[in-house]
């Protein structure tokens, strides 16, 4: 986890799940994201399904070469833009099996 006073997340060693938890700072939203990415990619940064790639299974070729942390950052921005929260994205996934 981050050291006290650290501000640059690129200098911190953490797993994608730890990074997501740190970024969201909300247990409920984190649990929704864990469910969502568990279904989409099993948190596998090398997962590819058709034109979708990475942990968030985004439709961006950039995700194929992005680090796992950058994939999570990308996914969180996508969720914020499209659904507002990971729980709303999860609810959409439960209805449609995609997000």
Locations of regions flagged by a protein language model:
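Membrane-proximal envelope biogenesis segments
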Residues: 1-8
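Peptidoglycan cell-wall recognition and remodeling modules
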Residues: 8-99
